[in-house]
Structure formats: C-alpha cells, structure tokens
Regions:
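GIY-YIG nuclease catalytic motif and its immediate N-terminal context
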Residues: 1-66, 70, 75-86
Length: 86
C-alpha cells in the first residue's frame, strides 16, 4: 500500500508527499532529513489517503499540489482533525 500525505507545521506551512511507510516518512521530516521541511519545526499529519499502487499515489499527489487540490486540503483541515480516506 502507498500513502499520499499532507503535513502541516505550527507556522501553517503545508507539505504534500507520498510514501510506502507513512510513520517512517513523518520521522524523516521531523528529524530534518528532507530539504524542504528541514529547520521548519515539528510536522504533523493532517491528511492521509491510501492507494494500491505507487502510480495512483503519485497521480493523487500531483492533484493535491494544484490550486484545487490545495483548496481541498484547506477544507479538510478546517472541517476536522486528521482526515483519512482510502
């Protein structure tokens, strides 16, 4: 299984990615091992979606990185805690 995930830090910054191991990937970001998230504080998962193939996950990741995708993320965050689908 593959996950598409959205992280948010205390400053309100958003990071969108995909992985096979979501917990390991969150640790990776919080230890500062990712160029984009390094030095930007603690990150938390605010949205996660599960897919059967990496191809599907990459497609969804790209969708979430569009204007409409970011609007979708903001609505999900606003309406509840950690959103999960799939």
């Amino acid at each position: 299984m593959y996950w598409v995930y959205v992280l948010k830090n205390k400053e309100g910054r958003i990071y969108i990615g995909q992985t096979e191991d979501i917990e390991k990937r969150l640790e990776y970001h919080n230890r500062g091992w990712s160029r984009y998230t390094k030095g930007k504080g603690e990150w938390e998962i605010v949205l996660k979606e599960c897919y059967n193939s990496r191809k599907e996950a990459i497609k969804r990741e790209k969708e979430l990185k569009t204007g409409k995708g970011r609007e979708y993320i903001k609505e999900k965050i606003k309406n509840r805690g950690v959103a999960q689908s799939g």
